[in-house]
Structure formats: structure tokens, C-alpha cells
Amino acid sequence: MREESWEEHDTIQLTAQRKYLAEVQALETLLTRELSVFLTEPGSKKTNIINRITGKTYALPSTELLRLYEHLEQCRKQGALMYFLERQGTYSGLMLDYDLKLNTNAAPPLESPALSRLCHRIFMHIKNTSVLPEGSHKIHFFFTLKPEVVQGKYGFHVLIPGLKLAASTKKSIIASLQHDATVQKILHEQGVTNPESCLDPHSASVPSLLYGSSKLNHKPYQLKTGFELVFDSSDPDYIPIHQIKNIEAYNLVSELSLTNEQGSLVKPVYCEADIAAEKEEEIPVDDHSLSILMLHDPEARYLHKILNLLPPEYYVEYPLWSNVVFALANTSANYRPLAEWFSQKCPEKWNTGGKEKLEKLWNDASRHTEKKITKRSIMYWAHKHAPQQYKEIVEQGYFSILAEYVYSYNGTLEHYMIAKVIYAMMGNKFVVDVDSNGKYVWFEFVLPGQPMNQGEIWKWRKEVNPDELHIYISENFSRVMDRITEHIKYHLSQPHETNILNYYKKLLKAFERSKSKIFNDSFKKGVIRQAEFLFRQRSFIQTLDTNPHLLGVGNGVLSIETIPAKLINHFHEHPIHQYTHICYEPFNPENPWTKLLLNALQDIIPELDARLWIMFYLSTAIFRGLKEALMLLWLGGGCNGKTFLMRLVAMVLGDHYASKLNISLLTSCRETAEKPNSAFMRLKGRGYGYFEETNKSEVLNTSRLKEMVNPGDVTARELNQKQESFQMTATMVAASNYNFIIDTTDHGTWRRLRHYRSKVKFCHNPDPNNSYEKKEDPRFIHEYIMDPNCQNAFFSILVYFWEKLQKEYNGQIKKVFCPTIESETEAYRKSQDTLHRFITERVVESPSAETVYNLSEVVTAYAEWYNTNINVKRHIALELSQELENSVLEKYLQWSPNKTRILKGCRILHKFETLQPGESYIGVSTAGTLLNTPICEPKNKWWEWSPNPSAPPEKEASAPTP
């Protein structure tokens, strides 16, 4: 690091000077113990002194002002850093602020003759603008200069502290001076390129720095010289000016103060017209909240520098600007001054309602947490646009935080101090939260180039122990500590007084002892323990993977919230922990593996409408939000590809998003409330669950079935864990070689079930005359299903059908026309639900029917039909009545005036009776017979077809063989 840059660290030097300068210690004692009774509220009109270090404001009487000036003068002479301002009161001295632009980096000479001429011209404007009092008066002019030229910019102040003027008079003087050709000529002779615009018009009212004070990380202006001008009203044309001798003998803080009235050299001179002005405009107390924030918050100073790296579009273009504001608001509510400062970088927008827009945006950020971007995004943007400058600022930020600890605690570093710096260095990469067991858990955001498992990139990885931090403390942190050593040695090489050199020697010795600790295992463990509290982000675990539209994939994060899906393979702030190892690639039907799978799907599900419906249904597995309450029951005798397809979906999604479920979950009795159910907990957070290979005639537990297919919250718990409540989000498929037995007549359950029966069988020697027999290919089960290329291709197919479902059916499976599955589901229901079979065969919708049936008449008709067609049994009328109320007849049942249920708008057929004009069977089938859904013949690009009841499918062709 360049030596001269060490002097930029005001905050470090402030800490150090408290240790070795008795004058600074005395000043702090005065402020905290004696002058605290004169503290004022921020914005108070009584304020006359502002301490930028602490942000405190004072209304000091003249006697206390003199005491403060005396302490400040002693600190100034010792070279102490100070940040005190005085508020220009209703009547105060005049300060002129000249901001010069030069053609060179050499400071202009500004010799006494030129400054004397400048004094004369300034006084002429004062005399012409104000009414000077009668008699002879001495008016003093002081010139303070900027210490150095910075990139062709320079400046100086003209202080006329004794002449007490009203703010309006000052403004008039400044306005007339701006157009003074003589002044412009004098400045031009000094090499100034902007003489017409270099005088700051706001210097009449802004708080003025007391002599010896400065802005943060700036050197104070230095006194060049002073002049004494004598004015006598009896001889106004004779105005002698001479240079002040032995000026350093005076208390310059006091003499150069614009508000002091008790100077030894400077005596106040009041203008009569200004004294007579009763209603003088108020001088505003400037808001120094940003300066105060940056003095006390190292991270705010750091962010201020980072924000300066962002290109203009970030404060000009509304979307980018709003993102910056949201990021600051979400990082800390205290960073409002940073947002205001950044917004003001575009004056045109700020002056046309910018403040109001910022106010609204800031409030929106505090209310709407879904747009959770933070300072991490600001860091990313800055690094993206200015990588080298970003690196320098980041390294400087670490150094500043550590240096403040070193100087504050005399070189001794403890666990928390190191942890604080580590947090500044790695706070964007690690997060800690407390899990359900009360343990602190570490998460690391995985970036390219570091060791990882497939799929962890661009996600938050759970760490048992943050090993990277352990290594970082010993290998990387030591370099920051080496810079502190350089900083201390730099001061040891300077011509300081003996007491200051002794301070730095002791500091270096203590710090060297602290440096060795970072290689000690037990010390590092202590640092990590302290870091847990700093890295803690409450409820972080609860926010992980809560966005159902975001899916962790092998090459990043896939967002399916928009169409088309978007792969996020760069920095982001989505809290994603789970993932599948599959890499997302956009759907490409020309990909050989995609062609292979499209052909396989065509073979496994020969009916085009059923194939599309099932693929639409399976595609919803990539979405983990609330879905339509459906479950697919897939019947097949074996060797028909259903198991391959279900397993492929599960393998593609991975264990985080999919789960194979134990069939006992559907067939066993429900556990009692206090018992654990690990099988049911497997559905928590999953987008897909499947059952397979059941025994013959398995009876499904209808209460569990309802719980699994109905939307809403469910409760369960793992072994030795607390009861949890979660939402059912899984797309579920149950496959079997035998039909399930579902002993319920509840229409609410049946309408959530879909049934499909496999027609195809894969054989070693298929019958060429049987279109339902296909040549088996063992590679699908033993080779292809494990191949990453096959898995990637199938994942792209799932995403393709998800996008198609959103675009063409608004994401609703029930809108997809599929007569094959509708008819097979109806047939399956009738085989299980005799009440439904009776309704679909014997009850017809008849709008013109005049007959109204009591519910008891419907019960009797069903009992007679059942005894004739099924089996003779004793029926319980009350149970049958309840079942009818929950059947498909529900919408036709009404209440009669005597509060009994009646069936209206329907007619019950007798045996062999036919339909009358205008009547139709209830249900999707026709008189109980299956719809004829033959195998669709070939059609090109079957995956592009959209099922539509008004447009029967065209003939299809097989996808080309890869």
C-alpha cells in the first residue's frame, strides 16, 4: 500500500489519538461531563455547535464557547483530527467558499498582493450592499487554503468573522461578487479556469467548519494569511489594508469563528440595517445524518464506497435505482441516508419528486419482504462493473475494521474482534441460523471453483463445521493483519514526539502477540463460536426453498415462474438449499436422447390424449406449491413401462423433490395422533411421490386417501421429533398390477382420482399382428435410466410440458381434454362404487320431468337395483341417504318446503327403458359403456398437439429414431 494513503484513515487516527494525546482526552471530558447540559435536539434552531463525530449538537453560551475554542486550539496545535462545525446564526461573519478548477495539479500561488486586491474588491461589495456603522472600524480577512490539488481541483475560503451580517445580506454580497470582472481577472491570473462559477452561492447559510476541523478523510484547510482593513465613515475613500503580523500567537479557532464576539484580535462590527431587520430568515441546520452514520458504522462507510462504483444507470433508470433502494432498506433501516445520498446523484430526478418516490419505495421495502435483495446484490453489481476498484475497496474495509480494534484495545485482539472482521470479509458467503433442535447451523453459498457435490453450485450448502472459515482465518486473515503491522511501522518511521513513538512501540509489541493466535486451533474455534452470533440470520432456515417456482438444478437455479423457464446460473439472493443433480437444458426435440424418450413415451402410452394428459400431470412435479387435488392410479400387468416412467421422474427430481412412498401409507390404518409417521413425512416439501408394485386386491384407506389428495395443511412427525404442519404439494401416482379397492361412495374423493390402464406390453418376441406388443429394450431399465444425458433430456421434457400447460391451459390439469382417462376413470369408479354405477345407468338428467322424488324413493330404487344386479343384502336407509347426498346427484338434490331432501330435474329409468328427447345420462360415459379410444395412428411431433374436444387429433407419426 502507498505510504501516503495511510493518512486517509481518519477513523483509525481518531481512535489512536485518544490514547496518546492528553489534549484530546481533555476535550472529550469537557464534552461529555460539562457541556452535555447544553445538548440540543437535532434540527433545533438554538444549535450553534455541531460535533460530526458523535452527531451531537449544542447551544453553548459565549463563556462555554470560549472554553471549547481553547480546547480545540490545543488539539489543533497537536495535529489532532477534529470535525466541529458552527451554525451561522441570524447575524454572523461572512464566509466565501471558492471551488477552483485548474489546468494543472500545482496549487496557484495566491500571494499577498493578489489576496490584498481580492480583499479590497470584496469589501467594496460589502460597502455597497450593507449599511456600515459610523466611525472607524477594523475588518479582518483570513484566507484558508485547501492542503493540496486533487485531480485539478483546489479551493480556498475567505473568512470575515468580525463583520456581523444577516443571511440575506450575505446572499446579496455573494450574488454581486459572482459577476465582478476584477475578481474574475484576479482568479484567472492565478490559473483558475472557472472564475465565473467558482464561488459557492450556498456559503451564506451552510454550517462552517471551525478552523482546524475537516470533513471525514479530508485534511483541514490551512491558514495562508490574514489582512486588517480599516474603514472610517468620515473618509470612505481611504481604505488602508495591511497584513496581520504574528498571527499564530492568537487562538485561531476563536478568532476565525464566524459567531464568536469575544476575540482578542477580531472585534465584532454590526451593520445597522441588519440589526434593524426583525424578521430575518431562519438559517437551516444541515442534516449530517450520512456523515454521522459513516463515522459510527464501518459497514456504512464501506457501502458508501461500493455504491460509488455503480455506473450512472443505477441512479438514473428507475428499475435499477429501485433495486438499490430495496437492497439498502433490506440490509438495515439505518441506511436511509445512504439511499438519499445515492438518489441525489441524479439531480434532475431528485428535484422532480425524487424524495417522495424514495419515501414510498423505502416504506414498500419494509412492508414487502418478498423482494428480498440486500447488500449482497450491491456487492455483486459493483464487482461486475468495476472488479479491480471493488477489490481494493473491499480489502480497505477489512483493514479499517481491524485497525479500529487494534488501536482501541492497545493491540490485543480477542475472539469477537476477529469474528467481527471475518463477518465483514465473509458475511455475504455464510449464514447461521438455529434449527428446530436449538443448534446453530452454518450455511455456505457455493460459488464456482470451490470443492462441491454436483448440484450445489449457486446454492446454500449446509455445513457441519465451516471448514473454509477455519482455513481462511489462518491463510487469508493473516494478510490483513500484516497490513496493520505495516501501518504501525509507518507511524514509527514518522518524526513524532517521544510519547507518541513509545505508544506505537507498545502497540506493535502487543499486536504481534495477537497475530500468532490465528494459527491456534482452540483460538479459532472461539472465533467461530463468536461468529455464529454475527452471522446469525433469524428465520433463514424457514425461508429456505419456500418459493415453489424455484428449483435447484445441477447448473444453478431454475425459475418456472415465467414462461419460458429461466436458468439462474449467476449470483442471486434466492434462499435455495435443495437441488437435483440434473442440469437444465432447454427442450430440444432434435437432441438424440430427447428423440429416444419421446419415442418411448409414445410406445408406453399409445393413446395420444392420455399420453399428453399424463405428461402434463407429471410435469407439475417440478412445482412444489398447492396444486389441483388429483391422484393418478395406474393399472398395468407388468412389462408395460409404467415403473420405468415413474422411477425416471423420481430420479430426475432427486430425493429433495421426489420420494418413493411405502404403499402401506395408503393401505394401513391411520396412526394415532401421538405416533410418528416417517413415511408420511416423506411428502413434506416434495413435488412428486409415487407408489408401486402392490399386492393383489389392496384396499385403500379412504381417510388417508382423502387427506393426501385434498389441498390444505396436514400434520405428522418424524421419530423423536415435534409434530409439524405442512401443505400437501406432491404430484402423486400409485401404480399396481392389480386394481385397488376403494370402498367409498364419496363423490368428493372420487372426483380427485384419475385412472389409466396400460395397454402395451414389452416382450422379447412381440406378436407382429398385435399392435399392443412392443419389442423390449433392457437398456431402458439397466442403462438409460442411469445415464445423465437421458435424465437431462427427460427433465427438459418435463419443463416443456409445464410451460405448455401454463400457456395453453392456464396451468390447470382439469382443463386438459382427455376422453381416454375420463372414460377409464368412470369405468373404474363404477367397478368399485355400485351406487355410482346405479346412478350412471338408471338416473338421467331430465329438465322437463315433472316427477319429483323423495330421497327415500331413490334409496328404495337403488336397493332394488342392487339386489337384482349385484347381491341380495340388507340396506340401511340412513347410510344410503347420506351416501346419495355425497354422490354426483348432490347438485340435483334440493330441500322441500317440509325440510326433506328431494331429487328434482332427474328421472329414474326402469329396466330396458330408453331416454326421452332432451334427456341425458349423468356422468361422462354413455349408458355405462366405455368410450371407444383406439390407438392413435402416427402424427408428426405429437408433443405439440393440444387436446381440444372440438378438434379431434390428427394422425400421428413416430418421432424419428436417434
From Swiss-Prot:
Keyword ATP-binding in record: yes
Molecular-function GO term, any one: hydrolase activity, acting on acid anhydrides
Protein name: Putative primase C962R
PANTHER family: ATP BINDING PROTEIN-RELATED, SF3 HELICASE DOMAIN-CONTAINING PROTEIN
Keywords: ATP-binding, DNA replication, Helicase, Hydrolase, Late protein, Nucleotide-binding
UniProt-listed GO biological process terms: DNA replication
Species: African swine fever virus (isolate Tick/Malawi/Lil 20-1/1983) (ASFV)
UniProt: ATP binding residues: G636, G637, G638, C639, N640, G641, K642, T643
Sequence ranges assigned to domain SF3 helicase in this UniProt record: 607-775
Entry EC number(s): 3.6.4.-
Domain of life from the UniProt record: Viruses
Expression induction or repression: Expressed in the late phase of the viral replicative cycle.
Family: Belongs to the asfivirus helicase C962R family.
